[in-house]
Design a protein with these regions (language model features):
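A short, structured loop/turn motif at beta-sheet edges
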Residues: 12-16, 43, 67-72, 91-100
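Beta-strand/loop substructures that line and gate deep hydrophobic ligand-binding cavities in soluble
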Residues: 78-129, 134-136
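A generic structural motif
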Residues: 59-61, 71-72
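Generic structural detector for well-ordered beta-strands
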Residues: 8-12, 39, 53-55, 65, ...
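Short beta-strand segments that buttress and anchor functional surface loops
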Residues: 50-57, 75-81
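Short, surface-exposed coil-to-beta transition loops
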Residues: 4-6, 60-64, 84-89
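Hydrophobic ligand-binding cavity/cleft-lining segments
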Residues: 1-43, 133, 139-143
Length: 143
């Protein structure tokens, strides 16, 4: 079973600025209400193989690992727990003078359906909060 949530929105900020916010994962708690903490487990630029410990309200700490990264455009990371793997995708596409952000959260495994039933509403709310945090922060940067 696979469950996926996806959200996209236009942002009145250059794609480069939006990208810099997306990959600065340790800054997310200052921008996004649905993140309590993000701690990188390695140093240097975000890259395939980078890992972070993420804490979100009402969820257990999770260890995320970057599985794909296309500089300036997208990155994906995954976390796994018994019976379920969760993948988060972050895509920035230029749109005129601004950008479009697309966020996805995909869960698969034997417990994916149960997670969708129990946590689907919270997942969608957190995804919306994440999008709003990125949009608000990107649009508030003087430029």
């Amino acid at each position: 079973m696979t469950a996926e949530d996806r959200i996209a929105t236009a942002v009145d900020a250059p794609a480069e600025e939006v990208w810099s916010l997306l990959i600065d994962v340790e800054r997310w708690p200052a921008m996004i209400e649905s993140y309590e903490s993000v701690r990188r487990l390695d140093s240097g630029p975000l890259r395939v193989g980078s890992r972070a410990i993420v804490k979100q309200p009402r969820l257990p700490r999770a260890r995320w690992k970057v599985t794909q990264l296309q500089p300036g455009r997208s990155f994906a990371w995954e976390t796994a727990s018994p019976g379920i793997t969760t993948a988060g995708g972050h895509l920035v596409e230029p749109r005129g003078q601004g950008a479009t952000i697309t966020l996805t959260l995909r869960q698969h495994g034997p417990l994916a359906r149960l997670a969708q039933v129990l946590l689907g509403r919270r997942t969608r709310r957190y995804l919306s909060m994440e999008m709003e945090g990125f949009r608000r922060t990107a649009e508030s940067v003087p430029g």
